[in-house]
Amino acid sequence: METFDLESHLQDAYSRFPEAKHQPVIGLTANYEGIDATLRDRYYKQVIAAGGTPVIIPPVADAQVIVNTLEHLDGLILTGGGDYNPLWMGEEPSPRLHNINQERDAAELMITRLAFNRQIPMLGICRGIQTLAIALGGKVCQDIKQLVKHSQDADRTEPTHIVEIKKDSTLYNIYNKEKIFVNSFHHQAVSEPGNHLRTIAKSSDHIIEAVESSEYKQILGVQWHPEWLEEEGLKIFQWLVNQANNFYAAKQLHKRILTLDTHCDTPMFFPQGIKFDHRDSRILVDLHKMTDGHQDATTMVAYLPQPQIGESFSSKVAFDVKGPAQYADLIFDKIEEIVSKNRQYLSIARTPADLYSDKRNGRKSIMLGIENGLALEHDISNVKHFAQRGIVYITLCHNGDNDICDSARGCNTHNGVSSFGEKVIQEMNRLGIMVDLSHGGEKSFYDALDISQTPIVCSHSSSRALCDVPRNLTDDQMRALAAKGGVAHTTLYHGFLRKEGEADIMDAIAHLEHAIDVMGIDHVGLGTDFDGDGGIRGLADSSELINFTLQLLRRKYSEQDIVKIWGGNWLRVMTQVQNFKH
C-alpha cells in the first residue's frame, strides 16, 4: 500500500552504508517543445532496468554547461525527435523536410562531439544515430526513398520490419543473430557514416539501420526505438550501462595511478605557432587532449634530423640556429615558455618524485628528452649541459649513423657504438641520464648494453617478430634488455606495428602482449611517438589514451600490472639511473 511517510521511503538508504551501490550515470538528451524540456519515460526506465542511473540533460548550447555536465557522466544516450536543420550539413532544405528543432540541434551536436573527445560511451536512438553521424563528419538523408515502411502506424511496441546485422559487430554480439525485428518511426536516415563510424546493419531496402565506432570505441547508433521493445530492447541499454561501468572503472583507475607516455614529438610543430592550451588540431598532444584522455605526463623530445652527407643541419630545421646544440636548447626554451604560461595546469618534471607531486597538485607534467645525440656536437661537456637543462634521456641516434653509434637505418659506420659513443654513455651514467636505444642498430644496442652501468631503455620500439622492420626489437634483444633490468615501450607508429593494412589499437595491444610474453610484465610500457607520425585508429592522440587502459582492463590485467605498463617500469629504471649519479 502507498505510504506518505517520508522516513519510511528513506529507510532503505539510511539502513545501510554506503547508502547506495555505485551505478554508472547515464545522461539522456531531452526533447524540447514550446517551453518544456521533456523525455518519454521509456528511455529512463530502460536505463534503470539495465542498472544505470539516468540524468536528463536539457538542450542548452553552452559549452561551459555541457563540459561540466559531461564531467559527471559515464555514458550518454542521444534520444529521438524531429529532423535536423540541413544547414548543419551544408545542405539546403528538401521540400520533404519535416519539423526541425533548433533548440536541440546545436546543443546535441556539441555534447556529442565533446563526449566523443572524452571517449564517453554513447548510444544514439533514431534521431540520435543521425546526431552521431552529423557530429562526427557523416551525412543524413533528408527524406529516404522507401521500399519498406519506415514510419509505422502500428503500436510502438510492435516490430514491423527486419534489420540485417553484420556478424563482426557490437550489435551481433548483443543479439547473437544476423536478423532481428524492429519498430520504425523515421523518414530520415544516415546516408554516410563518415570516418569515425561504420555501418553494421541495414534494412532490406538498404537503409542504414545501425552504426558503430570504426575505432574500437564504445559508440552505437540504431535507427529504431529499443526503449519500446521491452526485453529485446533492454539488451541495448544493458550494453551501454556495461560500457559505462567499464569507463567509470577506467576513470577511477586513472585517478589512482600515474600515466606516462615516454615519447612524443610535439616540439616538431613549434615552428607552426601551435597553442598548447588550445585544443589544437595541428598537434596530437595538448592540455585539452591530455585532460580528455586522463593522461598525467608526457616526455617531449627535441628531435634532431640527421643530415645526409653534404647536407647542413640548419637546412633541415625551421629555426635559424648555429647548430644542433643550440637547436635543442631553443626547443627546451620553448617548452619552458609553454609551461610558464600555464603554471596552474602544467609543470616540467625531472624526477619520478616531481611527477607524483604534479599529480597530487592537479598539474600535467612534461619530461624532457633528446632524440638524436647529434645535439652533443661531438663535445662530451654538452652531456652535462643538457643534464643541467633537466633532460631524462638521450636517444643515441635517429635515422642515420652519427658520431655516437650506428642507426637501425644506417650503413654500419662504426660497427656499433663508436669510441666517442662509449664516452657519452659513461658520462650519461655519471650524470643520471637514461640511455635510449630506440633507432639504434642491433650491434649498437648490444654494445650499449655492455657499456652502460645502468639499465638501458627503448622509449618507443615495437616487436620485430610481429612487424619485421630493422627499427623494431628482436625477441633476443628484448630478452637481453630485460636481463639487464631495462624496459622497451611499444610505439604507435603504424609502420612499426604492421607492414600491410592500417594499424589500430589492437595491433598495439598485440605488440605489448608479445613484449610481455618475451620479457615479462616488468619491462614494458607505452611510448606513443605522437606528433612524430605516431597515432593509429583507436589511439590517435592523447585524448584516446584511456582506451588503452580500457583494453587492458578487458584483458583482466591487475591494477598493479597496469601501473607498471603505464610508466611504473620506466620510473623504476629512471630512479635506478638517477640514483647512480655521481
Regions found by a protein language model. Give the residues of each.
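N-terminal hydrophobic targeting/anchoring segments and the immediately downstream early-domain regions
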Residues: 249-413, 468-489, 493-526, 530-582
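Distinct, well-ordered alpha-helical segments
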Residues: 138, 353-355, 379-383, 406, ...
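Histidine-centered catalytic micro-motifs
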Residues: 184-188, 221-226, 259-266, 440, ...
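Alpha-helix-loop-beta-strand connector modules within alpha/beta enzyme cores
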Residues: 414-431, 448-458
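Glycine-centered short loops/turns at secondary-structure junctions
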Residues: 51, 119-120, 137, 294, ...
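Glycine-enriched alpha-helix->loop->beta-strand junction motifs that scaffold or abut catalytic
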Residues: 216, 294-295, 391-393, 431-433, ...
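N-terminal beta1-alpha1 cap of cysteine-dependent amidohydrolase-like domains
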Residues: 1-125, 134, 141, 145-174, ...
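Proline-centered loop/turn at the N-terminus of a beta-strand
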Residues: 24-25, 53, 121, 139, ...
